[in-house]
Amino acid sequence: MIRTATLTIFHLFLSFFVAISTTLADIIEISDLAPLAELLKESDKDTLVIFDVDHVLIMPTDEHTLNRHPYRKQLWQEIESRLSKEDMKTLYGVATSKAKWRLIDPGIADIFGHLRAHKIPSVALTSIYTGKFGNIERLEDWRIKHLHDLGFDFCNLTPVKGEMLLHELEEQDGTPMLKSGVILTAQVDKAKTLACVLSRSNYYPKTIIFIDDILSNLESLERLSSELKIKFHGLHYTATSGIPMPVINEKIEKIRFQILEKEHEWLDYQELAARVPALTE
């Protein structure tokens, strides 16, 4: 009888533990913003909402994206096989400095309106490099400007004000930092960088909502949240997979990449037509 009772109690405890674990953390795949909007209805000042940037908030327009079309990706990889990492940074800086950007989903404006109206703490978390990058003097300022231009200002939403340089995490791709409510990891693991920001500021929310297009980033933050006993909602955002692939002209693209490699210029189609009139004939 005692053994039976003990086993029953153990099973009850195990069930309770599993239930608690399930409620503390979950990751779901979403293709639109409706699940995020629903989560925000239950959020308050004790929630931290974290947004990835590329392919979640913004992305380059079709003419300027470098990796969404297989042929462009192939041309880029061919150049990469010939050049050093530093030379590639230079070319990437040239190309990205001319890029035009678009929203992934215009409905994000309503999400940010809700965050501002209800004063829900929010930050951006991006793995982008920092510091000088090719002809871009400070990549962090370049990134923040694009966000501001498209309506994403985290300065009044971030719970951690000011600028924070994380020199202890510094590697070859720049210094991880917090600036204007944007955490830039310089290719350091997102969870590791976020943990440093939270520790330095002694700020620990009760709940984290994180939206990212890369599953491993979500899993990394899920583990961190578990360690910190923070409830976690991960949203694996796949909206870009439903956006039609850019329509390109392979002949034009090949010349475009040749000019990029040899002359360090990234031309749009109109500029290419002016440079090489025969392309439009």
Give, region by region, the residue ranges found by the protein language model:
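Boundary at the C-terminal end of the N-terminal hydrophobic targeting segment
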Residues: 21-25
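Residue-level detector of transmembrane insertion/anchoring sites
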Residues: 16, 42-44, 203
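Bacterial N-terminal signal peptides
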Residues: 8-19
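Positively charged n-region of N-terminal signal peptides that target proteins for export
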Residues: 1-5
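Alpha-helical substrate-recognition element adjacent to the catalytic core
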Residues: 26-34, 38-170, 184
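C-terminal cap/substrate-recognition subdomain and adjoining C-terminal extension
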Residues: 33, 129, 133-281
